[in-house]
Regions:
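Active-site recognition of the HExxH zinc-binding catalytic motif
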Residues: 266-282
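Sec-dependent signal peptide recognition
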Residues: 1-9
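Propeptide-to-catalytic entry region of secreted or membrane-anchored zinc metalloproteases
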Residues: 50-218, 383, 387-402, 429-433, ...
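Short, low-complexity, disordered segments immediately C-terminal to signal peptides
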Residues: 20-46
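Active-site scaffold of zinc-dependent metalloenzymes
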Residues: 207-261, 303
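Short beta-strand elements
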Residues: 431-463
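C-terminal motif of bacterial Sec signal peptides marking the signal peptidase cleavage site
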Residues: 14-15
Length: 463
């Protein structure tokens, strides 16, 4: 279904106001909200009794103050998504494919089926808990089941465990997995895959891991990530350990001491973190407000997963920005409705300004597939850093906006710091697609410089 939206002439304004001591009190002022400059209309009312003609439609302003909090935004987004899905017949969603890879001369590690059934059930429960807390209900990732248990696609490698496979073996393992799945009639290029590699050795309490451990190119239609298995990896290992088991673990460096709990937090937490990449989530960092909930899963959350079970910290959490992206991913949404259609996004208006110690990004969009939210990743460039994203984005905070009835958004970016920044604007669409536009600015003395931003905005706007 195409959403027909009137084409308006693009408005380009990038400005920097003077720094003020506090944000403006009224967030719905016509002078600050683009939604109030382009009003939507209500259906026609009763006829004029004297002329028999319908009166002029009443103009209604979108009240941004009603979506000022995270729960209010979630309610708005969920409602808009339900409306879109109700307009078309539901198409079955996708399920995460979990693959277990092992070398030719080695069997899978002991109890791998039972252990990974429980690990994935817990990861599924984590997502369910987080989506519920954020106001999206009982939403979680879908897993393939076989006789009531997790379905694992077992793939035997073509090489022996003689050094042929290592951390750098992601691409050759990917090719072997794709060939094996093709024999079962599965097009891996159209799936989201979690590849668990039985590439570790355990000698008592000494563990050596030499598995690929990262995600590769992903979008809402496909994705792939690699994680490691170990005999010591188990959900029970996340709980308080009365035996105080200490492991010696070697992965990239020499052997390092790990408690059993820390080992499982790191590697089960690493599994859900890398799975996030396989689901197309980049890194991000908790805002000051969000940090009250713990550590962002896609930041350093792989090192804090389920710490709350042991009362060692607040644990990991899912940011609202990433919950929005998962909400429409076919592995979560339960539908592939229009998943192969390009959103054909156009930014008709875009304005970046500095008001009340926050960067305000306002704009108006047009798209063939409804846009349910806009997200800004505010990514600071550290000293000596080359480029942004891909392991340089752990400090990127995320900020969200709903889309008004007149297809406008208003993102307010806070927690500002000095230095050079990349501001990535992501449009999230109802079919799971996400479109990225990049802006850059520098911050010095508490004031942003939008000189480069101004040039970039002029290239983004579609008249």
């Amino acid at each position: 279904m195409k959403v027909l939206i009137p084409i308006l002439i693009g408005l380009l304004v990038v400005g920097c106001g003077k720094k003020t001591s506090k944000p403006e009190a009224k967030t719905t002022s016509p002078s600050t909200s683009p939604a109030q400059e382009a009003n939507n209309t209500q259906p026609k009312t009763n006829q004029n009794h004297k002329t028999g003609e319908n009166p002029e439609p009443q103009k209604v302003m979108f009240d941004w103050s009603k979506v000022d909090s995270q729960p209010e935004r979630a309610k708005h987004i969920a409602r808009e998504l339900r409306v879109w899905r109700s307009l078309n017949p539901k198409k079955e969603g996708k399920k995460l494919r979990v693959v277990y890879f092992h070398p030719k001369d080695r069997l899978p590690l002991k109890n791998y089926e039972e252990r990974w059934d429980r690990i994935m059930a817990d990861i599924q429960q984590f997502y369910r808990e987080q989506m519920r807390q954020l106001g999206y209900g009982e939403i979680t990732l879908s897993l393939e089941q076989e006789r009531g248990k997790l379905k694992l696609h077992k793939v035997e490698g073509s090489a022996n465990d003689d050094g042929s496979y290592s951390y750098k073996s992601g691409e050759p393992i990917r090719r072997e997995v794709f060939r094996a799945l093709a024999k079962d009639g599965i097009d891996a290029n159209a799936e989201t895959l979690l590849i668990v590699c039985g590439l570790s050795r355990t000698e008592g309490k000494r563990v050596t891991i030499y598995s690929p451990y990262y995600g590769m190119g992903a979008n809402h239609n496909r994705g792939i990530c690699f994680v490691a298995d170990s005999d010591w990896l188990t959900i029970d290992g996340l709980k308080p350990d009365k035996k105080k088991i200490a492991l010696q673990v070697k992965e990239h460096r020499g052997y390092e001491s790990f408690s059993l709990a820390r080992f499982n937090t790191t590697y089960i937490g690493g599994t859900i973190h890398e799975l996030g990449h396989g689901l197309s989530l980049p890194h991000n960092h908790a805002t000051i407000q969000e940090s009250k909930r713990g550590t962002a899963l896609m930041g350093a959350g792989n090192y804090t997963y389920r710490q709350e079970w042991r009362k060692e910290g607040k644990g990991s959490f899912l940011t609202h920005a990433h919950a929005i992206r998962l909400l429409v991913h076919p592995v979560f949404s339960g539908t592939t409705q229009q998943c192969n259609q390009s959103p054909n996004l156009k930014l008709r208006e875009l304005k970046v300004s500095f008001e009340g110690d926050m960067i305000h990004v306002r704009g108006k969009i047009q798209s063939d597939v409804p846009t349910i939210a806009m997200i800004a990743y505010n990514d600071r460039g550290d000293r000596g850093q080359k480029g942004y994203q891909v392991n340089n984005d752990y400090d990127a905070t995320t900020w969200t906006s709903v889309i008004s009835p007149t297809k406008e958004f208003w993102i307010r970016v806070g927690d500002l710091k000095g230095g050079s920044h990349q501001l990535r604007l992501i449009s999230v669409h109802a079919n799971g697609a996400a479109i990225t536009h990049r802006l850059h600015y520098t911050m010095k003395g508490g004031i942003p410089d939008f000189k480069r931003t101004r040039t970039e905005v002029s290239k983004i706007i579609t008249p």
